[in-house]
Amino acid sequence: MRYIKEILKKNRIWVLVYIGLGIFNAFMANYKADYFQKVIDGLADRTLAFAGVATYGFILLVNYCMNYLDNYPEKKLEHGIYLDFKLLSLRKISTIDYTEYQKIGTGKLVQRIENGSTAGRNVLFNFWLRSIRDLLPTIGFSIYFIWKIDEKVTYVLFVGYAFIFIITNILLKFLYKIKEKILNSEELLNHYLVRGYMEMLVFRMSKQFPSEIKKTCNAKEDIVSSKVKMNMIHEAFFTIFALFVTMLDIGILFYAWKTKNLTVGSVVALIALIENAYTPIAVFNVLYVQYKLDKASYKRFEEFLGLKDDVQLRNGNAINTNVGKIAIRNLSFQYEERKIIDGLSLSIQKGEKIAFVGESGSGKSTLIKILLGLLKYNQGEVRLGDMELKEICLNNLYDRVSYLSQDAPVFDGTIKENLVFEKQVSEEQMLGALSEVQLSHLVENLAEGLNTEIGEKGTCLSGGEKQRLALARLWFEDSELVILDEATSAMDNLTEENVMKSVMQKMKDKTVIAIAHRLNSIAGFDRIILFKEGRIVGQGTFEELLHTDSYFMDLYNANVK
């Protein structure tokens, strides 16, 4: 309920307006039926005056105008609440612990957020707010006006409520099982869809699409079949309800004919008021069934929102030192049962150019993620400048660090946005940075220039172009520590050599840490650190290692081949 309360508080003014209008409209709908009784009886006994007709007309006018005005807060809340739940998910991603984030599959996460946002909107808006402002007032006013006409009919209403309650609980048992199956099938369907969209080349070349499409179709059939069953159960309830109300209407007519106690106006009013009294019950039962079913989706969404946050993003000390100086002592890191870094010690001086080299799985990228505060180490010490990493506010650290991963960190937006985000930078400066990374031709050949959209994950660019665009971002970042995790892996050798020469010239006063598999690209670095099985097994310059370290020579020879 925490997140629902948060959204209620955010929209409290419109919630109060929405509830107030709903109660007023519920009263007017029933008062209209009650006053209509007087109009009918006045016509029957010829006592109806012009004032009575005018009053009834005024009641209708007010009722219809207020119903029209009611649409504004209704739609504002309906759409706003749904999008507020989606915003909660984005805020969660901005603070979620990195290890928790790694466990989530993109397809399942997208579906969980979509289902959860819809379910959250339904729980809060369609069930609670509608019940409070529409259903309960309408039922209450209807019963009051029915009681004014005939008390005995009121007692029959209560018996009918009990009957409908029993029917609803029987139907709910079937619906719960079906809804759970639908949720699982929808997440599975979305998993296959996103996987197919994202890995098009892999599946096409391996001829896996027929198998993927078959599995997706099976999930689709399960969803369609289950939703049809749910709809039939819903419609069964409405059919039973319609038959019950019909029986009540006939009963009213029979009661009036037999007892002669009701006027024509009273009979007309009772039939209208019974409709007002029972329609909310039908709606409430459908909403209640949906509410119970939506709670399953919302629970999954809440579980995601409740995942552990990285509290160090906001907590911790502000940095008062240069983070380009790094001291690591006896560092160990274990993920589940696997020890990835084992008793590692390393010192890096301010402005030094360091390369991490080693086999896949040797701990290089893990150490980078520890230095960025993404992974929390089990034991040891990591000091940036003269401050312990665990005590630093990470948001403060990220102002001083630039990080480029192997998966080029470009996003769906324009070239300009990918270069400078929202910074105010002249076009001349941006073009200059692109020239340094040999991307001038990219802008020159595009009609929109810097405002060209590059597509999701930069799909309009080649792998090398994406990496160069990300590297050009370094020209506009005032960082003390630059980390390059195979940031040039998609470039050809000549382009890589020229681009890295420009980058290293630009970063000459900054500490640079690079992970590289193409060892020629780091030949000019001050020091190369060799990793194997989570330990440092050697270090030195390129020339020193090439002539004295057999492990480095093996890596180099494998790279050359």
Residue ranges and their predicted role:
Residues 208, 232, 276-306:
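Cytosolic ends of transmembrane helices, especially the final helix of ABC transmembrane type-1 domains
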Residues 98-99, 115-128, 132, 136, ...:
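An intracellular "coupling" helix at the cytosolic face of ABC transporter transmembrane type-1 domains
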Residues 27-37, 129-172, 228-271:
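A hydrophobic transmembrane-helix motif
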Residues 73, 79, 87-117, 192-215, ...:
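Short intracellular "coupling" helices and adjacent cytoplasmic loop segments at the cytosolic face
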Residues 1-10, 109:
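A short amphipathic helical element positioned immediately N-terminal to and/or at the very start
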Residues 58-62, 193, 267-287:
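Hydrophobic transmembrane alpha-helices
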Residues 321-561:
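ABC-type nucleotide-binding domain
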Residues 15-69, 73, 147-154, 264:
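Transmembrane helix-loop-helix hairpins at lipid-water interfaces of multipass membrane proteins
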